[in-house]
């Protein structure tokens, strides 16, 4: 086990307080790729930042995140700084938010090799240029000497991905690596992640097709809750949670827009109950209570449809056993 996240919650201590992540658990094995998917605001990016100690000071983080046996959440900043970059590589969300405007992009992509692998500057930049050309980043002739201001947003984002890959860390944590990219560039990112044979990946994305392409397992989040977690093929072919089913049905190739096909409930059960209930076609009185996480054949789902005796019957109809 490389990363073991146990019951991580994040609350922001301001105003009335905002619960951004609630009791999320997942694991990432060595060389495994896990994607966290969900709508904007579901808490998936905040979970990633919590693991890396990159949230603001008003964030209250509880739970555990063991990386090779060491709890990242309890770890001192100075100790974590030694791990980040060398063993954990982070690709932030946004078009090059992590790039220094005063340094060439070629040097910045090469810097993790220079800093953590102690590779000579000339050799590291040569490797960076090779990788950048592969991702079609920058001018072919000037790729080593260009500055961020000469790059488009998509180029900056691909440069950040190249920086994360070149470090050779045990694990890459990527936040929306395909955001703002066209289909051709997304294919380049897919190819890049497929090339990572010895590195694990924990990736946040709203793009289910991208998750399908690269994932071994997928965790689905909705309104700060983890609602489903299963092997990727199993989850995409046989989704159990109503939200996951609706999200997959809303994929463009399935012909349904996300606003269609939902039976709206008459009450908002956000306080203490299932947060998807107001949009769920299976909503019932029991949904006013918080559903437990049920596990069936390695497939986890947080829904009253799969809880208790009634849940066992419903699960068996879907070919599942507790």
Residue ranges of each PLM-predicted region?
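Catalytic Walker B motif of ABC-type/P-loop ATPase nucleotide-binding domains
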Residues: 172-175
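Short catalytic/signature loops enriched in Gly
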Residues: 141-144, 231-322
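Conserved ABC ATPase signature
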Residues: 146-151, 155
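Conserved ABC transporter NBD signature motif
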Residues: 60-71
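P-loop NTP-binding/switch modules centered on Walker-like glycine-rich loops
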Residues: 180-256
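A short, proline-enriched helix->beta-strand linker immediately N-terminal to the Walker B motif
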Residues: 166-170
